[in-house]
Design a protein with these regions (language model features):
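Gly/Thr-rich phosphate-binding loop signature of adenosyl cofactor/nucleotide-binding cores
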Residues: 1-75
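Cytosolic nucleotide-utilizing catalytic cores of signal-transduction proteins
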Residues: 147-389
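Alpha-helical segments flanking ligand/cofactor-binding loops in enzyme cores
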Residues: 72, 98-99
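Structural motif
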Residues: 56-59, 86-87, 176-178, 222-223
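Long, charge-dense
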Residues: 103-146
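Short, glycine/polar-rich helix-capping loops at beta-to-alpha or helix-loop-helix junctions
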Residues: 92-97
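Short hydrophobic alpha-helical runs that function as membrane-insertion/retention elements
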Residues: 54-55, 79-88, 105-113
Length: 389
């Protein structure tokens, strides 16, 4: 399976015959690379956006102290790696520079002066460009397999080329990012996507992560649902350590028998996300965890759903809208606690008598008797249908 990101380690492998040597930061070889940049002074380092491999000849640097400052500035700008030309302006790399790159897991390479550094940059740029092309092809093909599954010509052969064999088993998981976070920080989801893909490239190569609108969609190959859950839990923990987890809703679909069926797994994962978003539940849930919702999602006619809601809890919704009351919320909480006034009061931080009054009022508005089990069940289903609209 081809990765969606190119790492500094892969780039290094492609130019080992150019007399380039890694002298520090070996643990950072898994870092993703976006592009290359010549950086000869600390001022230029401030223009870095993160993810670059920087190249320096040392021109303009008069001592080791200035070199250390330059390296620190490059690393603070979140570059993925540093290549330094030694021989003419920089005679050698001192211990302080090496130690700092090891501490920050920033790969530091040296190239002798007789080596044409421009050729290394050219190879890097070609590899990065090729990877971007492959990433776009994979992302587009996965999107087509999900949303235009009947058009196999739009995705089957393309995914095969990139290592996604059609008869392998696949499972889709969805990270749905809060739209408010998207509007206020578009770069957030980009950083999150990069962080996840970087993690997968190191720890789990049987999965890719692509972005479609405000969702990050994971495609796992030959991976059970329980294993997917375990991997996602580790990814969330990793992203939390990078302060990249905000309001994210996560769902896992069922494993499919073919790439042709990943649209089903996506639909299931997306259904879980809808429920999690409605309940503001940030836990990772599988499709099999949502119980009766699986049956309710199978109802295709939205008009039937709306009619049922209107006939059961519609009057409470309308009453709350006109009177700025909260009977809808209180009634649902009451049903979730199997009709316990005290548990409902504890959950909502209100007095038991207040709950009793509001439940009686709800019965009056709906013209029902909530002491009857079938009535409570019917209203509970209406609430669940309300969740999926």
């Amino acid at each position: 399976m081809r990765r969606l990101s190119v790492t500094i380690g892969l780039l290094y492998e492609s130019v080992k015959n150019h007399d380039i040597k890694l002298i520090a930061g070996e643990k950072g070889l898994s870092k993703a690379v976006k592009w290359v940049h010549m950086v000869e002074n600390i001022e230029i380092a401030t223009f870095l956006e993160g993810g670059e491999v920087t190249f320096s000849t040392g021109i303009g640097l008069s001592n080791e102290f200035e070199l250390i400052n330059l390296i620190e500035g490059i690393i603070k700008s979140k570059a993925s790696g540093i290549v330094i030309n030694i021989g003419l302006y920089i005679k050698k790399i001192g211990k302080k520079c090496i130690d700092y790159c090891n501490e920050t897991n920033t790969p530091l390479f040296v190239v002798l002066w007789h080596v044409h550094m421009a050729e290394i940059m050219r190879v890097f740029c070609i590899k990065i460009t090729e990877n971007e092309k492959n990433s776009l092809e994979i992302s587009t093909s996965i999107q087509n397999a999900i949303f235009y599954h009947e058009r196999e010509d739009l995705y089957l052969s393309q995914l095969e080329i990139h290592g996604f064999k059609s008869e392998n088993k696949y499972c889709i998981a969805v990270f749905d990012v809060n739209k408010f976070d998207m509007i206020n920080d578009e770069k957030y989801i980009i950083r999150l996507n990069e962080c996840i893909e970087n993690y997968l490239s190191v720890y789990y190569k049987q999965a890719v992560c692509v972005r479609i609108n405000n969702q990050l969609i994971f495609l796992f190959m030959n991976t059970t649902e329980s294993k997917v859950l375990e991997i996602l839990q580790k990814i969330v923990k990793h992203c939390e350590s990078k302060h990249l987890i905000k309001s994210i809703f996560i769902g896992i679909g069922k494993e499919t028998k073919s790439i042709r069926c990943i649209y089903k797994s996506y639909g299931q994962a997306d259904s879980v996300v809808i429920i999690n978003r409605k309940k503001y539940n940030n836990d990772i849930c599988r499709y099999d965890d949502i119980g009766i919702y699986k049956l309710l999602f199978a109802i295709q006619d939205r008009n039937v759903i709306r009619s049922f809601i209107d006939e059961t809890i519609g009057k409470v919704i309308e009453y709350d809208s006109y009177n700025n009351t909260d009977y809808f919320t209180v009634l649902r909480c009451y049903l979730s606690y199997n009709g316990s006034l005290q548990d409902t009061a504890n959950e909502l931080y209100i007095h038991r008598n207040t709950v009793n009054y509001k439940i009686k009022k709800s019965e009056e508005i709906l013209n029902v008797d909530l002491s009857k089990l079938e009535i409570r069940e019917m209203i509970d289903i209406a609430y669940k249908l309300h969740d999926i609209l």
